[in-house]
């Protein structure tokens, strides 16, 4: 979308970093395959795709190996613009990566770092991670994101609520009796078993994606439709939620795992039968 709409600067470059020992060309092929899979045919443009692919380079690197950060340094040596580091990795590696980037002296006041949820396993670990990030980045340099907010349906919620007079005047407790949010997936873990089993649906989906949806649905109209105004109203919703007690968990919560079944005429293995699964796992896939 950004490439097609001309929102990317001509000098923008993208460096993919992972342990897989493949060439830049092989990595680019993976990107093309992903675009073909996830971009609808009506929007897919070969010329736009080729332009995007030319921006992409690849670096094979073990983020746990301090010596490998010199490979990243070499790959970035010709870059002159400020760099944003997108950490799509387990949160327990955030500090390791920050230490590694700092060791090759490429972090500046213009650097930015992007971290995705879940940021930690619980409140204590989340605070610890944020403290570690602040060793190298100021608050204005840190972007904590939830990719779910980029979905078209979620984006449309704000327009539906606040730019449509038909709904904006009726979207209140007098007209709405209750709210039910269902987030149903058409796929299973799809190769993410190693990550997901240590997180579970409550941490992976409920405390991030679902709470974000709840905030957008329940918040009051912000005084300004900008980042600060929307964030402020979301916080008010979260502070107004009734804390969950042990009795609530006992009486009102159901946890489960999906079993062998069929999705869109395709047979799918149950959670405990997925590739790499631990048959003794009690991690929830349904809440």
Range-by-range predicted roles:
Residues 1-115, 119-287:
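Secretory/organelle targeting and membrane-embedding segments
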């Amino acid at each position: 979308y950004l490439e097609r709409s001309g929102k990317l600067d001509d000098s923008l470059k993208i460096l993919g970093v992972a342990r897989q020992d493949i060439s830049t060309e092989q990595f680019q092929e993976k990107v093309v395959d992903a675009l073909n899979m996830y971009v609808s045919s009506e929007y897919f443009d070969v010329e736009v795709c080729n332009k995007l692919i030319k921006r992409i380079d690849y670096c094979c690197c073990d983020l746990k190996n301090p010596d490998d950060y010199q490979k990243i340094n070499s790959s970035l040596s010709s870059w002159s613009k400020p760099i944003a580091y997108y950490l799509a990795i387990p949160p327990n590696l955030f500090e390791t990566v920050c230490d590694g980037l700092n060791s090759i002296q490429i972090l500046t006041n213009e650097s930015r770092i992007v971290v995705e949820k879940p940021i930690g396993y619980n409140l204590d670990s989340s605070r610890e991670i944020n403290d570690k990030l602040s060793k190298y980045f100021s608050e204005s340099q840190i972007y904590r994101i939830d990719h779910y907010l980029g979905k078209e349906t979620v984006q449309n919620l704000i327009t539906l609520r606040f730019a449509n007079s038909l709904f904006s005047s009726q979207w209140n407790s007098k007209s709405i009796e209750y709210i039910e949010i269902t987030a149903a997936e058409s796929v299973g873990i799809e190769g993410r078993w190693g990550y997901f089993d240590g997180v579970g649906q409550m941490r992976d989906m409920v405390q991030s994606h679902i709470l974000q949806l709840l905030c957008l649905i329940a918040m009051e109209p912000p005084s300004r439709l900008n980042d600060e105004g929307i964030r402020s109203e979301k916080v008010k919703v979260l502070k107004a939620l009734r804390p969950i007690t042990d009795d609530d968990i006992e009486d009102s919560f159901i946890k489960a795992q999906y079993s062998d079944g069929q999705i869109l005429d395709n047979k799918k293995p149950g959670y405990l039968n997925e590739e790499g699964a631990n048959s003794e796992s009690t991690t929830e896939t349904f809440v």
